[in-house]
Amino acid sequence: MAAAAAAAAALGVRLRDCCSRGAVLLLFFSLSPRPPAAAAWLLGLRPEDTAGGRVSLEGGTLRAAEGTSFLLRVYFQPGPPVPAAPVPAPSLAPGENGTGDWAPRLVFIEEPPGAGGAAPSAVPTRPPGPQRCREQSDWASDVEVLGPLRPGGVAGSALVQVRVRELRKGEAERGGAGGGGKLFSLCAWDGRAWHHHGAAGGFLLRVRPRLYGPGGDLLPPAWLRALGALLLLALSALFSGLRLSLLSLDPVELRVLRNSGSAAEQEQARRVQAVRGRGTHLLCTLLLGQAGANAALAGWLYASLPPGVGDPGEDSGEAGVHFPWLPALVCTGAVFLGAEICPYSVCSRHGLAIASHSVCLTRLLMAAAFPVCYPLGRLLDWALRQEISTFYTREKLLETLRAADPYSDLVKEELNIIQGALELRTKVVEEVLTPLGDCFMLRSDAVLDFATVSEILRSGYTRIPVYEGDQRHNIVDILFVKDLAFVDPDDCTPLLTVTRFYNRPLHCVFNDTRLDTVLEEFKKGKSHLAIVQRVNNEGEGDPFYEVMGIVTLEDIIEEIIKSEILDETDLYTDNRKKQRVPHRERRRHDFSLFKLSDSEIRVKISPQLLLATHRFMATEVEPFKSLYLSEKILLRLLKHPNVIQELKFDERNKKAPEHYLYQRNRPVDYFVLLLQGKVEVEVGKEGLRFENGAFTYYGVPAIMTSACSDNDVRKVGSLAGSSVFLNRSPSRCSGLNRSESPNRERSDFGGSNTQLYSSSNNLYTPDYSVHILSDVQFVKITRQQYQNALTACHMDSSPQSPDMEAFTDGDSTKAPTTRGTPQTPKDDPVLTLLSNRTSLPCSRSDGLRSPGEVVYLRMEEMAFPQEEMPNFEEHRSQQVSLSPVAVPTTAASDPECCNIHLDPEASPCSSDSEENMGKKLLRTLSGRKRKKSADGERASEENSNLTPLIT
């Protein structure tokens, strides 16, 4: 029977060796001498599962690792029937305490060390087995049998759940050093008595510590296993980082860095370039090292981490959950995070520095792997020929520059120039030429007179094609503007004479010529202008050359710099898209009337700005409209000195008084129109602020404040030693209604309904402040200047006036001798100086002047040109002397207008004069020719009821 037992044990070993990690099916029958009939029910046992290799049956002994839970199948022989009445038993034995528990039960008790096969003398003396089985204190706490026996599905077998607890630290070390762990024997309760099954029957359980691997081999401590895994992972990361940092550096890039990088980059590139030159050998070395490190890490983790994991609860009664793929999962995650992601994140940003500092280590690794990697590298070089480097074509280089734009220090203009230079070879002349219809050209039969030369100079071109006949396609010559240096326009030299003398060669290119070729031709100095032509083979006739346009050096430079070069003569920003230059038109205006001289104006403004100012005031500002002031007088007023002024803004003293054009509650007597700059307006007591810019105006009521009197006779002035007096008119204002008064409301003149006027001098008091925010240029017209302009305008529009003769010869002064006779106002031939068309009514809001106030017209300050008098041959030595004309005004009790007449007794005039004084004065100042008034006969009657106002 012993031979049979040994054979069965050998069979179990072979099954374990052949079916690793599989369930060991072993039926172990005790072949020892037959026990008494009461214990014959337990025949043998076997593990139902191996718990991932942690449970096995070796040499007749059941082996399990600590912390394992497994199912145990037991085989038994059914015993006699259970008695009906319980039999008294010791108090500590289950089933014998009077409870009637006759169910079979299994427990484990710990055996002393060496009991598994040591000599009897070496085993410590203990009580017999059955006696120990009865003592509950001797039952093993490290091995528990969970629950009662359950039916095993086969007659004569049952299943029971066994759990092996974790051994304590000292017990694990003693068990490991003593021969493979702690030993436990089995105690069985058959319902009547306890029976001990030990080594004799093969019912032993040996618990081994976890320091043993899945195959039972001894493993190092946990800290040593973790350290080994970290070292292998670091080695894999090292090979991965070297591969990324070294192989990502292209030889071309290293050469560029060595020649154009910084000092540190040049040194690093020099050190790496020697190793990177043997690319295939380096590649094989690094890949071999990384593959070996990854494989070693996987094997180490498989040996260190148990493949079976699980610890079901006490009442679950199921085997542990098995994860044989756990080492592979841990190895994959560690390699992915530690050996791929981290090295790539670092080496992709600092690859050159890492590669240069690890050159010595790389050389050592290449030398270690030389026997394997060098032949393989040579084989790859022979099979794949030369190593493929990163070479950029023109298109790839352009895209690289565009992609690197956010990270490079290239500005947009530099990038455009590089792009234009690289695209120069891909463009042809036809894409950049100027069509023939847009070219400025001259006929060959033209004459270089003043008009032609002026047109050439106004065009702004320096090279002008010359065509023959009526066909602009027939270009026969080129005219350079510098060829006209010795040409006098008064000589009317034929253009053909100049072109034949210089004989400039024509440079013709075809429409499909590349721009780089044309640029090379221009660089040779032949010409900077080429005629673009193409072969026209359309139709049935013979092919011929057709001129499409011209191309210049400027066109090619514009394509290189990717921008348009505009000069003062360009009308279009792009010859192809026909986009006009802003604020530049082809139409030419003659602004000679607005060309100013130094004596006329102190602040320099352009004629265009003067024209715009004149048009704006004449159409938008009520007091300066043609209804009240003629455009000619307005222009002379704008040319008057000190009318257009400039004011500089001081950043350091922003609140200086000189920075205010108007201050709230401070009287003023001038009007301001802003031409350039910005101002800030503060309105009312609330201090509301807003900004205004060019062509905003203020203070219109300041120049419109006036008063008149119809009771007093006022002295107008003297001309050539004679006085001119103004008489009152009994008639009242009837020409304009109050709704037509230029001093209306704030909406018309920028004033306010709450604005005040000084009672003493009728000055306008604004309720707002105007403060400049930058350098400004503005028009400033005082009330006196405006009144002078009104007087001149009224005198210009007066139909009749007494004539005068106030011109002297030499140094003598000749007083006038002819006077008129006084007449009544109704029959008086003396007419008013103002007409109904140019009269200005009074307003109650304007305020009235004091009786003693005198208004000086100061016509000598108006810059009027002198003209030749009608009898210039007789009076060429006489001059016109203008003196201030005093117009005293008096206050009126109501807002009535005054009618001002000339006193015939006080006015020096000729009895047979056909021209009034106002006409002659205005004609003398403005340069107009003498013209008789068609309405002279009806002037007195028509103006008898008009009461215009001069203030």
UniProtKB/Swiss-Prot annotation:
TM region(s), chain numbering: 23-43, 222-242, 282-302, 319-339
Tissue specificity field: Predominantly expressed in brain and testis, and, at lower levels, in kidney. In the brain, expressed in hippocampal neurons (at protein level).
Residue stretches of biased makeup (Polar residues): 731-740, 814-824, 942-951
Annotated coiled-coil segments of the chain: none
Keyword presence, Lipid biosynthesis: no
Membrane topology: Multi-pass membrane protein
SUPFAM superfamilies cross-referenced by the UniProt entry: CBS-domain pair
Chief place where the protein resides: membrane
Keywords: CBS domain, Cell membrane, Ion transport, Membrane, Phosphoprotein, Repeat, Transmembrane, Transmembrane helix, Transport
Further details from the record: Shares weak sequence similarity with the cyclin family, explaining its name. However, it has no cyclin-like function in vivo.
Protein family according to the UniProt entry: Belongs to the ACDP family.
Protein's name according to its UniProt entry: Metal transporter CNNM1
Originating organism: Mus musculus
Annotated gene: Cnnm1
